[in-house]
């Protein structure tokens, strides 16, 4: 099955053995994030129309926005998910980079307040690799190739690079692929970390984030961070997005006063209360273990 419209990156770009970033990890431990660091927590939502009223930063998928003839106008900053995980999970093809970029430009210019957009990256979870029939290294090469294409076609569009892998060494090798292409991730304003959202209860995720920090790649975005991940790894992230509230709401009855739906899986009132509760819980923790990631004002409950 062919799962890409992208040209393959040359095999010669594969980094074997310790590369530049791997060597950097032997220098010194990663510094802890300082309290008060200005960071962002993006509330994930399936409902793009929330952009018109939300007073908190949102994370919205291109797969949800692309069908809108009339786009909403954003009240607050937001970031765009490319929907790459769902695309690969379903065995679908990515749109050509220029087609994706045309949509991103439309969102930026019409919706406004766009912080950044994710690339069409290739996740490296074992079940995704089984679906595509490709190697982890090939997914990494395609991730880097897509970012380079997007940047070449639209240097004015804020696409963030994403590192993919499964082990700490994998992520450093992916970073070295970027470096071989002239992209120094230590200087990037933000770097996404992919293929971590389903294993945040493991020590592997902490090891990956710590390893990237020690390599000098410190401004990290965690995709799909769950509540436990927020508590354990928040101090190693500059930003994160989460839709954990929706899964929790699906397993519970609706909030008192919510009479229009059988659960609150798509309810902004529930989402804002969840966000406020999670932030309050993290802020209530001792200062020595409190995550600077969520040093944000509480969201209004509507």
Feature names for model-found ranges:
Residues 64-65, 83-86, 195-198, 243-251:
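Short, acidic/turn-prone active-site loops that include or flank metal/cofactor-
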Residues 100, 104, 171-175, 274, ...:
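Generic structural signal of hydrophobic/aromatic residues within well-ordered alpha-helices
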Residues 60-61, 78, 97-101, 136-138, ...:
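Short, low-complexity, polar/charged sequence segments that are solvent-exposed and flexible
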Residues 2-145, 299-302:
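Non-catalytic, usually N-terminal nucleic-acid engagement modules in DNA/RNA processing proteins
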Residues 105-240:
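Eukaryote-skewed repeat-based solenoidal scaffolds used as protein-protein interaction platforms
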Residues 72-73, 90-98, 114-119, 151-155, ...:
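Low-complexity, flexible helical/coil segments
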Residues 2-52, 152, 180, 207-220, ...:
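Alpha/beta catalytic cores of nucleotide-metabolism and tRNA/nucleoside-modifying enzymes
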């Amino acid at each position: 099955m062919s799962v890409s419209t992208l040209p393959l990156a040359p095999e010669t770009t594969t980094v074997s053995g310790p590369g530049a970033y791997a060597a950097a990890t032997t220098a010194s431990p990663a510094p802890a994030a300082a309290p008060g660091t200005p960071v962002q927590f993006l509330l994930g939502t399936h409902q793009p129309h929330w952009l018109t009223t939300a007073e908190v930063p949102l994370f919205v998928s291109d797969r949800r926005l692309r069908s809108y003839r009339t786009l909403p106008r954003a009240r607050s900053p937001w970031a765009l998910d490319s929907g790459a995980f769902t695309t690969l999970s379903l065995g679908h093809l990515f749109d050509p980079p220029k087609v994706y970029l045309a949509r991103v430009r439309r969102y930026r210019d019409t919706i406004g307040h766009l912080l950044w957009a994710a690339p069409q990256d290739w996740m490296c979870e074992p079940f995704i690799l089984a679906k595509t029939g490709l190697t982890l290294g090939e997914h990494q090469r395609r991730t880097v190739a897509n970012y380079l294409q997007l940047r070449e076609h639209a240097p004015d569009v804020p696409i963030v690079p994403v590192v993919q892998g499964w082990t700490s060494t994998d992520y450093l090798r992916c970073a070295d692929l970027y470096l071989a292409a002239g992209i120094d991730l230590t200087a990037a304003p933000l770097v996404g970390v992919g293929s971590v959202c389903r294993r945040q209860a493991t020590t592997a995720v902490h090891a990956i984030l710590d390893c990237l920090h020690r390599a000098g790649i410190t401004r990290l975005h965690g995709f799909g961070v769950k509540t436990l991940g927020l508590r354990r790894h928040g101090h190693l992230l500059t930003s994160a997005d989460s839709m954990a509230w929706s899964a929790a709401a699906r397993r519970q009855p609706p909030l008192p006063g919510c009479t229009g739906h059988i659960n609150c899986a798509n309810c902004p009132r529930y989402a804002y209360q969840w966000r406020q509760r999670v932030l309050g819980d993290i802020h209530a923790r001792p200062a020595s273990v409190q995550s600077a990631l969520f040093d944000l004002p509480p969201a209004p409950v509507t």
